Amino acid sequence: MIVTAILSGVILGFFVNQIRAIVIASAKQDLLEQAQIGLDYTAQDVRVSANADDSNRWPDANAPNPTDQYSWQSNASSLILATGAQDQNHNVLFDDPSKYITAKDNHIYFISNGTLYRRILASTITGNAAVTTCPEAVATSTCPADKTILQNVASFSVQYIDGSGNQVVPSSARSILLNVTLSKHEYNQDITATYAEQMVFRNDS
């Protein structure tokens, strides 16, 4: 009787541990899929952009430094993309058509309170379909909320790579290497997943 009870307890404990391991593995896989989707989105934005800007080219009333509307910086944790402006029909807009120099919006990827956001700073060129975005707390109909890319972000890093594979200043980069770690505390433990992705710029004017 005692032996049977002990064996039953051992078997039950084994199955409980197995189920717990499966659930944790599933949660980790979910985090990994979220990380991949988020970086795929960001990498696609890199692919259609001309380059990284060292700082924002358009003023932002919600910039990191409230007294400096040009205080965004491309660095190890923030990325400023120079992305071609388009009209409502997805036609490219040009600052200088004779030299094929396209107008550029800024797409800014940054972390705030464990969330990766994308902010748009729209070019002032006539006909631009893009709209400047704002933090959700101050968003309006004319300045919609920044797009949420990823939540539960434990770390997010950006590396700026030239054609020879060397790390360079943002504006000299030929490609961008993104790395993100997501983390959630579930089942009395921290569950994490890390994903990295590299993408080359389109590199037009």
Model-assigned labels for residue ranges:
Residues N17, D45, S49, R119, ...:
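Phosphate/oxyanion-binding loops and surfaces in catalytic or ligand/nucleic-acid-binding neighborhoods
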Residues A130-T133, V138-S205:
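Short linear sequence signals and composition-biased patches located at protein termini or domain-edge surfaces
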Residues Q34, Q73-S74, A173, T194:
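A generic fold-level signal
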Residues M1-N51:
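Aliphatic-rich helix starts adjacent to a transmembrane/signal segment
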Residues D68-S164:
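Type IV pilin-like appendage domain
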Residues L31, A35, Y109, S171, ...:
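Aromatic-acidic/polar surface patches that form glycan- and anion
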Residues N51-Q69, Q73-N75:
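Short amphipathic secondary-structure patches
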